[in-house]
């Protein structure tokens, strides 16, 4: 069954008005009156709905029932991704959305060979957010991850304190691995996890040292 998001609470809206979604419903999926859809509202609650009218600019529905299924992870995972070359961030954003991350933040590390140019940032972020939106629908998410504006490494270090724990994957780490580290945690007390992933060229030893000195756990897969 196809899923759609609305920006209001379900009690305040009985319409899908996102024009891309309206076109997708009527022209691509060719849904009709009485067809069922899934609607997720601004509170990230999921509802089974029935289409009752389709016009050029909106789709009207009625709520059949709330769907009480836990779709999201019990912890917010924020991925700080080193800016990769080319269009790789498109695929990264799509796959991270599909596996349940909460938000994605591009980071400019020293060894990044690419960057998101300031004059193209808004357009790039908007395109990535559209990719995330479609991936959230396809993977039955109730939360649409947000792709944040790129940050510098210094900004990343300051950001670490906003998370319960932070981890970084480093190719030179040989002892501490992801599985054993998470086995040692009481995840019921963890609200958010910052996951730091470097660019193709890796993270410099100096960056790793600074991350570790600010409480980040250095791990190998």
Which role fits each region the language model picked out?
Residues 1-68:
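N-terminal positively charged helical leader segments and presequences
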Residues 102, 191, 217:
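Short acidic/polar active-site loop segments enriched in Thr and Asp
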């Amino acid at each position: 069954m196809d899923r759609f998001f609305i920006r209001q609470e379900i009690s305040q809206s009985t319409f899908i008005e996102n024009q891309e979604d309206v076109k997708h419903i009527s022209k691509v999926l060719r849904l009709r009156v009485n067809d069922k859809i899934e609607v997720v509202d601004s509170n990230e609650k999921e509802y089974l709905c029935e289409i009752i009218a389709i016009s050029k600019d909106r789709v009207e529905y009625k709520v059949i029932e709330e769907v009480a299924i836990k779709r999201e992870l019990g912890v917010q995972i924020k991925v700080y991704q080193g800016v990769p070359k080319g269009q790789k961030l498109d695929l990264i954003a799509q796959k991270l959305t599909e596996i349940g991350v909460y938000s994605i933040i591009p980071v400019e590390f020293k060894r990044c060979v690419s960057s998101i140019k300031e004059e193209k940032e808004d357009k790039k972020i908007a395109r990535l957010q559209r990719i995330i939106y479609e991936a959230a629908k396809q993977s039955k998410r109730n939360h649409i991850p947000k792709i944040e504006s790129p940050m510098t490494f210094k900004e990343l270090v300051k950001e670490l304190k906003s998370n319960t724990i932070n981890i970084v994957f480093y190719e030179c780490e040989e002892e501490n691995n992801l599985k054993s580290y998470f086995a040692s945690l009481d995840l019921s007390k963890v609200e958010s996890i910052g996951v730091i992933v470097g660019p193709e060229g890796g993270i410099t030893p100096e960056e790793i040292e600074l991350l570790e000195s600010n409480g980040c756990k250095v791990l190998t897969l």
